[in-house]
UniProtKB/Swiss-Prot annotation:
It is a multi-pass membrane protein. Keywords: Anion exchange, Cell membrane, Ion transport, Membrane, Transmembrane, Transmembrane helix, Transport, Vacuole. This is Boron transporter 1. Present with 195 molecules/cell in log phase SD medium.
Length: 576
């Protein structure tokens, strides 16, 4: 009943006396106050609803990730009873192990022996086991690669004049970074990942693959100098030949499933084990005798089993590496922690996205908020143990998913074997590699073979990179182009402008990592994401849908979309 009708009713039930007038006045005042309170409550409720729509509940992203993934935890292990798991373990083990050792050598040389093989092996093993068993998305391979090695030795070069403990400083960098990881995860800031498109991912993928090729070349240049410091042309030339021949044969057999030779099963088998067989064969080749006896191939560096590498910068009898540093240095570590968080925010999440591309036809839910929080905890553990902090790997993460794909005879993807066993077991294998017998075996692998593996991984990654594919399309004979390609619908002008943006972004990333300013290259990654927002004003909508699309299907990023998490509640019993 409205206030006006109530007032009329009261006035009719009273005489013209003063008492009736006073009663009427009091009633009207009470109704006015009630109306005012009701309107105030309504305004507050509306404001609460508006706030709730704008800002999701703290931690709701992590809750939704866990809510989606926990029902699949049992099947993540049961589904591992599939043949695709075996070649995936072998391939992922070598793809993760050998490049990590090469980057360990970089850090060993440029941090005065602070980080070595054992630190990198322990970091990769911990990451594989933790994310294999506890991770939300076990397809994403986590370990040590180029960006974090660049970060670690750049920090060392910057703080060396401060005369402070490197491991104490890295401990506080990891502590600050862990705090920022958890803050970003619990405030649902990982939702910003929904705006990451293929443009920055392709740039970063191109950058990583070129860095792998660069690393292979750097390894070969070191083969021309003997341990005594003298030049050794025959050793260097022999190493170059082994690396290039291994690359040629490795790529030939890696791509064997595209050839018409033999049956589909045989082609798949050869392609599956090409990486492992290449490493084993060409490592054995250097022992074939003859003129090879006159060549001294440099081998991979190894150290004492399960002991820290450095005999100067940290105690040898424990993996607890923390050393006290002045309070001012604790706060000097703060901006470095921010840079590390930015690097991992982009590097890890993009690795996870690329491991869940729409063409892989995944069926199980993703996990971004929870995994980023878990990454913060592994970063903390790394600081305590004095090992490089691990994060998502490119190209290892998407390569891992590709090894699990089930294809038909025409190489079309049918499904993917989504499980936890491969990530977990390759982590255990890397941990086992820290034992003395396996370290000795590892020490028999020539550095030339490692260089060849870098070339294989880098070139194989370039062949599937969209930027390279568009360059090839642009310079192809118009009469030989695939008329069914979506790029046929893009004008040459738009193609050139878009490629200019892509190559500029790549050049910026690659250039800054080769300077003292390498610590700031995560900002270049962030800038490439921001640049993509301007494309809507530069390219026609239909062409932009072809040039810059979403990395993963909407099902994969559903917990990153604000419209899906704004009104979500903890322990909500109602399912959509």
């Amino acid at each position: 009943m409205s206030n006006e009708s109530t007032r009329v009713t009261v006035s009719r039930g009273c005489t013209a006396s003063d008492e009736c007038a006073q009663a009427l006045e009091r009633t009207n005042d009470e109704l006015d106050r009630e109306s005012s309170v009701s309107e105030s409550r309504s305004d507050e409720e509306s404001h609460e609803k508006l706030s709730r729509r704008r800002f999701p509940t703290l931690g709701i992203g992590i809750w939704l990730d866990l809510k989606d993934r926990i029902p699949y935890y049992k099947s993540d292990w049961v589904d591992a009873f599939n043949y695709r798991v075996i070649p995936s373990i072998v391939d992922t083990y070598f793809n993760n192990l050998l490049p990590a050792i090469a980057f360990a050598q970089d850090m060993f040389d440029r941090t005065d022996n602070s980080y070595g093989v054992n630190e990198v092996l322990l970091s990769s093993a911990m990451a594989g086991i933790v994310f294999g068993v506890l991770g939300g998305q076990p397809l994403c391979i986590v370990g040590v690669t180029g960006p974090i090695s660049i970060f670690n030795y750049t920090v060392y070069e910057i703080i060396k004049p401060l005369n402070t403990s490197y491991f104490g400083f890295m401990f506080w960098i990891c502590m600050w970074s862990m705090i920022f990881h958890l803050v970003l995860a619990f405030t649902n800031a990982v939702c910003l990942l929904q705006y990451v498109t293929t443009f920055p991912c392709d740039i970063f993928g191109l950058f990583i693959n070129v860095v792998y090729i660069q690393k292979g070349i750097q390894i070969l240049t070191r083969q021309f100098s003997a341990k005594s410091g003298e030049k050794s042309v025959q050793d260097g030339f022999a190493s170059v030949v082994v690396a290039l021949v291994m690359t040629a044969f490795g790529l030939f057999f890696k791509l064997f499933h595209y050839y018409p030779l033999f049956s589909h099963r045989i082609r798949t088998f050869i392609s599956d084990y090409s990486t492992a067989l290449s490493v084993l064969f060409w490592s054995s080749f250097t022992h074939f005798g003859g003129y090879l006896h006159d060549v001294k191939f440099k081998k991979l560096p190894i150290t004492k089993a399960f002991f820290p590498t450095s005999k100067v910068n940290r105690p040898q009898n424990t993996w607890l590496a923390y050393e006290p540093i002045p309070v001012k240095d604790v706060f000097i570590a703060l901006p470095f922690g921010i840079f590390l968080t930015i690097l991992f925010y982009f590097d890890h999440n993009v690795s996870s996205l690329m491991a869940q591309r729409h063409q892989y036809k995944l069926k199980k839910p993703s996990s971004f908020h929870y995994d980023f929080a878990l990454l913060g905890l592994t970063t903390c553990i790394s600081g305590v143990l004095g090992i490089p902090a691990p994060n998502g790997l490119i190209p290892q993460a998407p390569l891992h998913t590709e090894t699990l794909l089930v294809r038909d005879s025409n190489q079309k993807v049918i499904s993917c074997v989504e499980q936890r066993f491969t990530n977990t077991f390759q982590g255990l294998m890397i941990l086992g590699t820290m034992t003395r017998p396996l370290l000795v075996c590892l020490g028999e692998i020539p550095q030339a073979v490692l260089s060849g593996l870098f070339f294989i991984m880098g070139i194989n990654g370039l062949m599937t990179n969209s930027i390279i594919q568009r360059l090839v399309f642009l310079f192809s004979d118009p009469n030989r182009r695939d008329n069914t390609s979506p790029l046929m619908k893009v004008s040459k002008k738009s193609m050139l402008i878009f490629l200019s943006f892509s190559l500029t972004g790549f050049a910026g990333e690659f250039a800054i990592t080769n300077t003292i300013a390498a610590i700031g290259f995560p900002l270049v990654l962030l800038l490439s994401v921001l640049v993509s927002f301007s494309f809507a004003y530069i390219f026609p909508t239909e062409e932009l849908k072809i040039l810059d699309t979403n990395v993963a299907q909407k099902f994969t990023i559903k917990n990153l979309l604000l419209e899906n998490i704004r009104d979500a509640k903890f322990c909500d019993k109602h399912e959509d």
